[in-house]
Amino acid sequence: MRKMLAAVSRVLSGASQKPASRVLVASRNFANDATFEIKKCDLHRLEEGPPVTTVLTREDGLKYYRMMQTVRRMELKADQLYKQKIIRGFCHLCDGQEACCVGLEAGINPTDHLITAYRAHGFTFTRGLSVREILAELTGRKGGCAKGKGGSTHMYAKNFYRGNGIVGAQVPLGAGIALACKYNGKDEVCLTLYGDGAADQGQIFEAYNMAALWKLPCIFICENNRYGMGTSVERAAASTDYYKRGDFIPGLRVDGMDILCVREATRFAAAYCRSGKGPILMELQTYRYHGHSMSDPGVSYRTREEIQEVRSKSDPIMLLKDRMVNSNLASVEELKEIDVEVRKEIEDAAQFATADPEPPLEELGYHIYSSDPPFEVRGANQWIKFKSVS
């Protein structure tokens, strides 16, 4: 009797509250899927665009939520490590733009290709690398995805051709990847990303021309986050309709803060390219919460109130969360459990990224040429011979 009373007392006092919460989540009957209305895309040289309604399954919703939370927390951890001077050099964060990288990946196949600019952490993750590999690369450790030598911009994954530090230079490369897809007869597309700040680069228009001329399966994607470094799009461009910039290339403007809009637009664009019609252009209207880079506080050319308004009204993670909870695809408690798991994953990765050793100096020349004999590289003080290994 005493044991029974003690057990009842523990339940009433809340000692079993956390396990009970898990039982509640596990036993609740959730919907398998739900249909949502999404914003209609603005179109250029297209008679029809992506659908204005879409179905989200519970499984996909939970996956998207976890991925976006992981990207958000990973970027916030990178911010912390940078301020602690553990991450050094250039570092461009993408928090606020999670619906872009996760939504684009949801609309293509793993065998498709992607190349982007220097704001690349989120795409590196969605292309399949772990948080541990990404943070270790940021801190310059051997366990990083590029052996600690690439840093923030130069990360690689399967069918991901890294970021590019030269503004707009990745766009002709993306057209070249699309050319390889067509030349080799593969049913694949290349997503070629650039920002609104790069949209005025001449090489981009040259890539447009060749892609259209050769009908390459290339999706040109402008991530319009409203500011090129510290310059607003209105001050930098005579026309801010970036989806029309291709002129002879069809385009669509997409709500880049809504992962479902991004997913459906990407599926539409990929199907267009796979059909042999040639390239298509997408403009994702999005927003970055951080400044241009870690050296930019981000409040000298925009107000804190503007940033807060976007956070409160258009945050991509909150938008997905509200949809899932209100349509019985998930519960608040279940999503909180995901948040806890993501935070733990990030902390574990950060510990690895700070404890893993840096690559030794003698490995500086590794992974440059695959089969050439050893060569000499001039060091700071003397000539040092490095091995050339794959």
Swiss-Prot record:
Protein name in the entry: Pyruvate dehydrogenase E1 component subunit alpha, somatic form, mitochondrial
Which residues are recorded as modified (Phosphoserine)? S232, S293, S295, S300
Annotated organism of origin: Macaca fascicularis
Instruction: Indicate the quaternary assembly.
Output: Heterotetramer of two PDHA1 and two PDHB subunits. The heterotetramer interacts with DLAT, and is part of the multimeric pyruvate dehydrogenase complex that contains multiple copies of pyruvate dehydrogenase (E1), dihydrolipoamide acetyltransferase (DLAT, E2) and lipoamide dehydrogenase (DLD, E3). These subunits are bound to an inner core composed of about 48 DLAT and 12 PDHX molecules.
A single GO CC term for this protein reads: pyruvate dehydrogenase complex
MF GO annotations:
metal ion binding; pyruvate dehydrogenase (acetyl-transferring) activity
Residue numbers binding thiamine diphosphate: Y118, R119, G165, V167, D196, G197, A198, N225, H292
- Annotated pyruvate binding lies at H92, Y118, R119, A157, G165, V167, D196, G197, A198, N225, Y227
**What's the name of its gene?**
PDHA1
Tell me, in a sentence or two, what this protein's role is. The pyruvate dehydrogenase complex catalyzes the overall conversion of pyruvate to acetyl-CoA and CO(2), and thereby links the glycolytic pathway to the tricarboxylic cycle.
An example GO biological process term is: pyruvate decarboxylation to acetyl-CoA
Q: What is the lineage of its organism?
A: Eukaryota, Metazoa, Chordata, Craniata, Vertebrata
**Where is Mg(2+) annotated to bind?**
D196, N225, Y227
Cofactor list: thiamine diphosphate; Mg(2+)
- Top-tier EC class: oxidoreductase
Question: In which compartments does the protein localize?
Answer: Mitochondrion matrix
